[in-house]
Curated annotation (Swiss-Prot):
Transmembrane segments: none annotated. The gene is valS. It comes from Staphylococcus carnosus (strain TM300). It comes from the Bacteria. Keywords: Aminoacyl-tRNA synthetase, ATP-binding, Coiled coil, Cytoplasm, Ligase, Nucleotide-binding, Protein biosynthesis. Its EC number is 6.1.1.9. It catalyses: tRNA(Val) + L-valine + ATP = L-valyl-tRNA(Val) + AMP + diphosphate. This is Valine--tRNA ligase. It is found in: Cytoplasm. Belongs to the class-I aminoacyl-tRNA synthetase family. ValS type 1 subfamily. InterPro entries: aa-tRNA-synth_I_CS (IPR001412), aa-tRNA-synth_Ia (IPR002300), Anticodon_Ia_Val (IPR033705), M/V/L/I-tRNA-synth_anticd-bd (IPR013155), Rossmann-like_a/b/a_fold (IPR014729), tRNA-bd_arm (IPR010978), tRNAsynth_Ia_anticodon-bd (IPR009080), Val-tRNA_synth_C_sf (IPR037118). SUPFAM superfamilies: Anticodon-binding domain of a subclass of class I aminoacyl-tRNA synthetases, Nucleotidylyl transferase, tRNA-binding arm, ValRS/IleRS/LeuRS editing domain.
Length: 876
């Protein structure tokens, strides 16, 4: 194999993934002598293609599993997808609607065929995207939440929970989505502030003597009112408790009752009670044995209980009802009112509180079990730790979970009703006399099945299955903090309840991927980025490295094309350094030829030490999920130290005549680059495999090579300190050259003065580095040098770098040039100061623009101070 002159990600990545999969590198070894490491992929919905959030999620998971595989663990990274009930059904219904067909037109069976066809199409897209990202998944174990194995687990859990009293069927107020025509759980409702109205109406007393004032934001629900309540301690209403009022329009008599729930400070202090359309009213209705009158149907239209408004949309009814009340002089006032209104997370429809018979999970005992577990040694480790408080708080305030959905796509509830007696049968299989029973048509909330994901995918409820025994509990869950309640919490309490173990050791939570300006990515804003477009432009390795290292745990990530491009430049730097190294190592040099036992130069010892320090740092940081810090450590070592310094230093022996020294340099280049590729591999799998295959190595793929370990034999602390001092000296020389505008191509005298005999000896022994990088016409290293009158000086530790300026530059011209430059920076400072002191600008300009101006000021001030210091030094 030969490395091309230029890095081309398309060429590097082509065919590589298929080879990895076909050769089975991602399959767990099953070696019983090895410790296991398992991650189950958070199953993406089959509603569409993957977005950047998925790419971030899976990149972190792949880094962890690739690293653990290299560290000798029996590693399983299990793929799978979620049927995503309401979301997928909505997509397929929309597709049918475009053809003028509804699901009811074609029936349940035919509709489900359409959904399965959709699922197959989008599952194929998702697998293609996983491949493009380079994810080390074991496809032999791929799962889908509607697979028979997972469906069996769902049925068993439902039946067991029902038998334990943890699942019950009851009539309660639930969140109803009139567009999807299904119940929703509390966390599927998004509350948004809406500019609405607060309507104040007269409810006349039945005896004809006056009225009581009632305020509401939802006038259409008054058609279902069955009482008025006031606080028993409210002096204004003590005399009317027990009286009756007439419900306008309907003319139904309503009793006035006392209930402590009423807030005397809110509105008029009197409250209408609509038990079928408000959760608080429902509780009041239960206490006072009130009738519950449902006035809407499942589409949000008024039903026959709404009288003349029957058939109207709820909001149309609201407008008409208010007009009718105005005609009867029953409207006191209408106020503007901003209030939080629940919307369906999936359809965006305004959610209707609705009295309905549904299936519920009794959450109190399950939440208690999860909270108690966090006080034991078996507790789940949240990263960052602050999210444990978020989890605990939600569990402490949890309400029962509505799990039935009025959909067709999903796990049909394993409950049957006797056709004659109405008796309920709940079982994993249908009743023996199935012809006498009818199965509940509803399906389970998607999150019910995905809550079982960590163990149902590994063979549960067959607790003797090999995968369940070996790979459960899993080691880490990596997901966004936005689904702690939807998914993470449910996996925890389901796992504890049914396996007796925590489903994972650690939960690593990342934030959201945002646009460059910090706004959330969305279709409506048109600021979304397709990860496949990024991969086609810059390669998977560039995207992966950016996603992995661009943020710290728990924080959002701002997508930046510029930053992805800078990673691409980093990979180019690695590519070029590797090409140079491989060309100089030569085809004849083999892995077994590496010999680091003798003749190591100072630079060799330094880079070997820094390699081992970086291996330790990267290993420790990865174990703590500090991927951003890993990125900095790798960049610093690879770009700043290996590429910029060691590669250049290696040219000294490689261009020399000493063959033994050349062989040592080949050994060091091979050793360092090969281990660096292994260390970088989990982050950049494609380019590291390409380079590794061209290096002397052992084994057939970097995927299954060993993670590099720290080798104490190649840790040379004194040599490292010495080399770092040499580098600082060279940097000081370069800085001084820059300040007097003297290019490296021009040889100049360089003096280094130090009183430290050991430093002098070390510099004497390593003059070749100073000569190569400083380009001196004369190099003097001494304990006793008299500094010339005209010279640039720079203190470096226990030494001083001196550049005599006599004859080197025209001092007067240089000072004049610098004074012009300082005038330029002063005028820039004046301009930006004027802008920032302008109150009109500061008050009206966007924060981003103001911050940009402040950054400019800081930059100009630094440049001004630097030039000023150079002028003063030259004048001195």
């Amino acid at each position: 194999m030969e490395m091309k002159p230029k890095y081309n990600p398309t060429e590097v990545e082509a065919g590589r993934y298929q080879e990895w999969v076909e050769k089975g590198y991602f399959r767990p070894s099953g070696d019983k002598s090895k410790e296991t490491y398992t991650i189950v992929i958070p199953p993406p919905n089959v509603t569409g293609k993957l977005h950047l959030g998925h790419a971030w999620d899976t990149t972190l998971q792949d880094i962890l599993t690739r690293m653990k595989r290299m560290q000798g663990y029996d590693t399983l990274y299990l793929p799978g997808m979620d049927h995503a009930g309401i979301a997928t059904q909505a997509k397929v219904e929309a597709k049918l609607n475009e053809q003028g067909i509804s699901r009811h037109d074609i029936g349940r069976e035919k509709f489900l065929e359409e959904v399965w066809s959709w699922k197959d199409e989008y599952a194929s897209f998702i697998r293609q995207q996983w491949a493009k990202l380079g994810l080390g998944l074991d496809y032999d174990r791929e799962r889908f939440t509607l697979d028979e194995g997972l469906s069996k687990a769902v049925r068993k859990v439902f039946v067991d929970m029902y038998n334990k009293g943890l699942i019950y069927r009851g009539e309660r107020i639930i969140n109803w989505d009139p567009e999807a025509r299904t119940a929703l759980s509390d966390i599927e409702v998004v509350h948004e502030d809406v500019e609405g109205k607060f309507y104040h109406f007269k409810y006349p007393y039945a005896d004809g003597e006056g009225y009581i004032e009632i305020a509401t934001t939802r006038p259409e629900t008054m058609l279902g009112d069955t009482a008025i309540v006031v606080n028993p301690d409210d002096e204004r209403y003590k005399d009317v408790i027990g009286k009756k009022v007439i419900l306008p329009i309907v003319n139904r008599e309503l009793p006035i009752l006392a209930d402590e729930y009423v807030d005397v400070e809110f509105g008029s202090g009197a409250m209408k009670v609509t038990p079928a359309h408000d959760p608080n009213d429902f509780e009041i209705g239960q206490r006072h044995n009130l009738e519950s009158i449902i006035v809407m149907d499942e589409e949000g239209k008024m039903n026959d209980k709404a009288g003349k408004y029957e058939g109207m949309d709820r909001f149309e009814c609201r407008a008409q009802l208010v007009e009718d009340l105005k005609e009867q002089d029953l409207v006191i006032k209408i106020e503007d009112h901003v209030h939080a209104v629940g919307h369906s997370e999936r359809t965006g429809a305004v959610v209707e509180p609705y009295l309905s018979t549904q299936w519920f999970v009794n959450m109190e005992p399950l939440a208690k079990q999860a909270l108690d577990n966090q006080k034991t040694d078996n507790r789940i480790n949240f990263v960052p730790e602050r999210f444990e408080h978020t989890f605990n708080q939600w569990m402490e305030n949890i309400r029962d979970w509505t799990i039935s959905r009025q959909l067709w796509w999903g796990h049909q509830i394993p409950a049957w009703y006797h056709k004659e007696t109405g008796e309920i049968y709940v079982g994993e299989t249908e009743p023996e006399d199935a012809e006498n029973w009818v199965q509940d048509e509803d399906v389970l909330d998607t999150w019910f099945s995905s809550g079982l994901w960590p163990f149902s995918t590994l063979g549960w409820p067959d607790v003797e299955s090999e995968d369940y025994q070996r790979y459960y509990p899993t080691n880490a869950l990596v997901t966004g903090y936005d689904i702690i309640f939807f998914w993470v919490a449910r996996m925890i309490f389901q796992g504890l309840e049914f396996t007796g173990e925590r489903p994972f050791d650690d939960v690593l939570l990342h934030g959201l991927v945002r646009a460059e300006d910090g706004r959330k990515m969305s279709k409506s804003l048109g600021n979304g980025v397709d990860p496949m477009d990024v991969i086609n432009e810059y390669g998977a390795d560039s995207l992966r490295y950016f996603l992995a290292t661009g943020s710290s745990p728990g924080h959002d990530l701002r997508y930046s094309t510029e930053k992805v491009e800078s990673v691409w430049n980093f990979i180019n730097k690695i590519w070029n350094a590797a090409r140079f190294s491989i060309m100089n190592i030569g085809e004849e040099f083999k892995f077994e030829d590496i010999d680091l036992s003798k003749n190591l130069s100072l630079a060799d010892k330094w880079i070997l030490t820094r390699l081992n320090e970086t291996i330790k740092t990267v290993t420790d940081l990865s174990d703590r999920y500090e991927f951003g810090e890993v990125g900095r450590a790798l960049y610093n070592f690879i770009w700043d130290e290996f590429c910029d310094w060691y590669i250049e230093m290696s040219k000294i022996p490689m261009n020399g005549e000493d063959e033994a020294q050349k062989q040592v340099t080949r050994s060091v280049l091979s050793y360092v680059l090969e281990r660096t590729m292994r260390m970088l591999h989990p982050y950049m799998p494609f380019v590291t495999e390409e380079i590794w295959q061209n290096l002397p190595h052992v084994g057939e793929t970097i995927v299954t090579s060993a993670w590099p370990e720290v080798e104490e034999a190649y840790m040379f602390e004194e040599s490292k300190q010495a080399m770092q001092y040499v580098v600082e000296i060279i940097k000081a020389v370069r800085q001084a050259r820059s300040e007097v505008n003297t290019p490296l191509s021009k040889a100049i005298p360089i003096y280094i003065k130090t009183k430290d005999a050991e430093i002098k000896q070390m510099l004497d022994e390593n003059q070749h580095y100073l000569e190569r990088f400083g380009h001196p016409s004369e190099l003097v290293i001494s304990t006793d040098i008299e500094t010339p009158d005209k010279a640039m000086t720079s203190v470096v530790g226990a030494g001083e770098v001196i550049l005599p300026l006599e004859g080197l530059i025209d001092m007067d011209k240089e000072i004049a040039r610098l004074e012009k430059e300082i005038d330029k920076w002063q005028s820039e400072l004046d301009r930006v100061d004027k802008k920032l002191s302008n109150e009109n600008f500061v008050n009206k300009a966007p924060e981003k623009i103001i911050n940009e101006e402040k950054a400019k000021k800081h930059d100009y001030q630094e440049k001004f101070d630097s030039v000023k210091a150079r002028i003063e030094q030259l004048k001195a």
